[in-house]
From Swiss-Prot:
SMART domains: RAB (SM00175), RAS (SM00173), RHO (SM00174). Belongs to the small GTPase superfamily. Rho family. Residues 195-197 form a propeptide. GTP binds at residues 13-20, 60-64, 118-121. The gene is ARAC6. Signal peptide: none annotated. Keywords: Cytoplasm, GTP-binding, Lipoprotein, Membrane, Methylation, Nucleotide-binding, Prenylation. A motif (Effector region) lies at residues 35-43. The keyword Membrane applies. One of its GO terms (cellular component) is nucleus. It is a peripheral membrane protein. InterPro entries: P-loop_NTPase, Small_GTP-bd, Small_GTPase, Small_GTPase_Rho. This is Rac-like GTP-binding protein ARAC6. One of its GO terms (molecular function) is GTPase activity.
Amino acid sequence: MSASRFIKCVTVGDGAVGKTCLLISYTSNTFPTDYVPTVFDNFSANVVVNGATVNLGLWDTAGQEDYNRLRPLSYRGADVFILAFSLISKASYENVSKKWIPELKHYAPGVPIVLVGTKLDLRDDKQFFIDHPGAVPITTVQGEELKKLIGAPAYIECSSKSQENVKGVFDAAIRVVLQPPKQKKKKNKAQKACSIL
């Protein structure tokens, strides 16, 4: 594929899990040190993945409940979702299946989801857990289990602060759109054929 294709990629997840930081880290190679709820503008860039040039449109969303009615407006036309949770927040991990998957299936059925665990740098930071005794780390195994539970084609852990795996998140999102995983459901449909005698 040599022609440029537009891919709309929308980030979703609880407030303060690091969606905006992930986008800023990816697009500008910098890490914002202060938490400012969703100020990232839509961004577009030409990216080459596996020899294919795509125009990647990045859309940020607000995770806070105040935006529950407005947020789905950005889902229209999405090619892929990046569903983020914090690797140091059990609540954000649990909300993936409790809140976000039902919302995405309702407003954007069939759109692939890349599951992303953010704040990887803090998961092994002992001082962080001393300072935040209520924080619960999420393991890679738990992330992989959640990926299977929600049927996501990819799960990636990253750190916007250290930039570890940040590019990998967006490369995975592009790959999921350009090379969708093979669907296993086709065999099931053939087995469920109706016979009238």
